From Swiss-Prot:
One of its GO terms (molecular function) is oxidoreductase activity, acting on NAD(P)H, quinone or similar compound as acceptor. Pfam families: Flavodoxin_2. Binds 1 FMN per subunit. Disulfide bonds: none annotated. InterPro entries: Flavodoxin_fold (IPR003680), Flavoprotein-like_sf (IPR029039), FMN-dep_NADH:Q_OxRdtase_AzoR1 (IPR050104), NADH:quinone_OxRdtase_FMN_depd (IPR023048). This is FMN-dependent NADH:quinone oxidoreductase. It comes from Alcanivorax borkumensis (strain ATCC 700651 / DSM 11573 / NCIMB 13689 / SK2). Its cofactor is FMN. Keywords: Flavoprotein, FMN, NAD, Oxidoreductase. The gene is azoR. Quinone reductase that provides resistance to thiol-specific stress caused by electrophilic quinones. Also exhibits azoreductase activity. Catalyzes the reductive cleavage of the azo bond in aromatic azo compounds to the corresponding amines. FMN binds at residues 9, 95-98.
C-alpha cells in the first residue's frame, strides 16, 4: 500500500491538522505494516504560486518549451505522479480566514492540468485519474461544518471529483479556539472517528 500524505498547516507538525494526519497514518500503518508513506509538507517544502511563466509552461507544447518551462512542467507532473502512485491519500486541511491555505491552493494549481488530470468533453468535464480513497482531516478554530460559512469542504470535494477522485471522506475537529475543554474533546472525537474509519 502506498500512502500519500499532504500536510498544509503553516505550523508544520505543530498544527492540529498535522497531528490528526499523523494519527491517521499511524493507524493505516498498523493495519498495513508494509505500507510506504510519501509525505509532502507544503509548509516546509512550499510549492510556487502560479504566475505567468508557470501557466505559459503548462500550455506550451513540449517541443516548444524552454529549459525553464520544461522544469516547471516536470515539477507539476511529479506531483501528479505522486497521486497516481498512491493507494490512499491523507490530507491535512486547516481553515484560514474561511479558505484553504495558500500553499495547498498552489499544490492544486499544479495538479489540476487540462488533458492530464481532467479533460473537457461535450458532456462537460471528465476526471482522468483513478478513483481512490482520500481522508481529509479538517481542523478549524470555530464550528463551520454544515453551514454556509464552510466553503472549504465543497471546494475540496469539487477539486478531487474534478480530477476523477470521488471517494473523499472528511473528519472534522472544530471549535479548537473555543477553549481548552472544547479543543480536547473535539480532537478526541476526531481521533475516534478516524480510527473507526481506518
Amino acid at each position: 500500500m502506498n500512502i500519500l500524505v499532504i500536510k498544509s498547516s503553516v505550523f508544520g507538525d505543530n498544527g492540529n491538522s498535522s497531528a490528526l494526519v499523523n494519527a491517521q497514518v499511524d493507524a493505516l500503518k498498523a493495519k498495513h505494516p508494509q505500507a510506504t508513506v510519501r509525505v509532502r509538507d507544503l509548509s516546509t517544502d512550499p510549492i510556487p504560486h502560479l504566475d505567468g511563466n508557470r501557466v505559459s509552461a503548462f500550455f506550451t507544447s513540449a517541443t516548444q518549451r524552454t529549459d525553464e518551462q520544461q522544469a516547471i512542467d516536470a515539477f507539476s507532473l511529479a506531483l501528479i505522479d505522486e497521486i497516481k502512485a498512491a493507494d490512499h491519500i491523507v490530507l491535512g486541511l486547516p481553515m484560514y480566514n474561511f479558505g484553504i491555505p495558500s500553499q495547498l491552493k498552489s499544490w492544486i494549481d499544479h495538479v489540476a492540468r487540462a488533458g492530464i488530470t481532467f479533460r473537457y468533453t461535450e458532456k462537460g468535464p471528465q476526471g482522468l485519474l483513478e478513483n481512490k480513497p482520500v481522508t481529509v482531516l479538517a481542523a478549524r478554530g470555530g464550528i463551520y461544518a454544515g453551514t454556509s460559512n464552510d466553503t472549504v469542504t465543497p471546494y475540496i470535494k469539487l477539486f478531487f471529483g474534478f480530477i476523477g477522485i470521488t471517494d473523499v471522506e472528511f473528519v472534522f475537529a472544530e471549535g479548537l479556539n473555543m477553549g481548552d475543554d472544547v479543543k480536547e474533546k473535539a480532537l478526541a472525537v476526531a481521533r475516534s472517528e478516524l480510527l473507526a474509519s481506518t
